[in-house]
Amino acid sequence: VDQKYLIFLIITVFVLSGTIRVFTLIWQNKFAARISNEITYKAYDVVLNQDYPNFIKQSKTDLIAIIHTFGNNLLVDVINPILFLFESTIFISLISFALFLYNWKIFLSIVFFLSAIYFLLFKKANKILKSSSLKQVNFNEKLLDRLDVELNSIEYIHLGNYQRICSNNYAKYDREYKLNTANYLITARLPRILIENLILILILFLILFLYINNNISQALPILATGALLAQKSFPYIQKIFENWSSISQYKNAALSVLNYSIRYQKDNKYNNENRKLLNFDEIEFKNVNFFYRKNSKILNNINFSIKKGDKVAIMGPSGTGKTTLLRLICGLLNPSSGSVLINNKEINKNKNNEYTVHWMRSIGYVPQKINLTGKTLRENITFKNNKKANNKIKIEDVIEITLLQDLVSRCNGLDSNILQNSFSISGGENQRLAIAR
């Protein structure tokens, strides 16, 4: 290529690359956000729709980490870097093409030099990042688990004066987590500093060599062109390495989200809109046995009947199966053997799924531990369901039935922020909120 066209060629490449960068910046981030949202939505839907026995075996903290924390990692540290890899590759290809047309010998020399260096870096970094990726997931789950347990045990911590012990233990895990993150960042960014300095030293030695041999004036245009191309292309080469490092670091976190997302099923014919409310006449247990694990029977040959209008209390020591029995009545669990009948019709998701789902829609369940779900009483009563939240008459009826008028008055209405204003809600009021829900 004639040198008089070189400047024009370089300007064209830079204008084109700048235009591409603007459009790709906007497109990549919005596209990555949509993809990440779709994946985490599907993963969360799968978590909520999995069989109840499988769900209760899992750590809720781990599930929160997978859906929220790792879902965010998926966007920032995996999908975005993958898209930026494409952008960097396109730009480097344009620069390489221009350099090849200008001087193919210089092009091949640079390619060989950088390939050799980055091959060694990739080989070394891969071992570090492989270990770091597994640690990242483990540390994150430990931190969330510790926070969940301790913040839900604040009475025990205050009574035992364990505040400093808990904060010191948290600091230990957090330190390990952040040092692991720091090691990843060092691994990803150190090559840029090393290679930039190495290239600068080589250029200075080359200039010195040419100066000694009185050839610097002839080589100056080539050096200037090479320096300009290097200044524009090297950040993208390093970006490729950093993006690869990010993907390697967070791939295990991303895979944990994808593992749920791929099991997503779009159609759910038993959603709320298609469920029928069943009238209740009789609940009957016939020879019901249940065990969570083999050789660990919880219920043994249970037989009883509850008629409409009966008031029944199930009593017994802890661990004898009272909660399990209620879960069987609700249809959350299937008997290991025997039958649970509602109106002389068996409820069992493995045998009669449609009828069981309709029954589950028709029954109310108030657990021992009630979690507040929103900032206002309205959000707690309606479970953040906008359609229910706007049904004023229905909400007023529910409040009257569950005797929550005093609580609503004390909290200055349904829409006051009960968490921000530190309203005291008793255990009994919590239970009635759950009944209202």
Where are these regions (language model features)?
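Hydrophobic alpha-helical segments in the permease module
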Residues: 10-17, 21, 114-117, 192-199, ...
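Juxtamembrane loop-to-helix connectors within ABC transporter transmembrane domains
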Residues: 28, 48-94, 180, 189-190
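Short intracellular "coupling" helices and adjacent cytoplasmic loop segments at the cytosolic face
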Residues: 33, 41-71, 146-169, 243, ...
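Transmembrane helices of ABC transporter permease
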Residues: 83-134, 205-219
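Cytosolic ends of transmembrane helices, especially the final helix of ABC transmembrane type-1 domains
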Residues: 139, 143, 155-162, 186-189, ...
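The feature captures the beta-strand-to-loop junction immediately N-terminal to the Walker
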Residues: 315-317
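Helix-to-loop junction immediately C-terminal to a conserved catalytic motif
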Residues: 330
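Conserved "ABC signature" C-loop
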Residues: 367-417
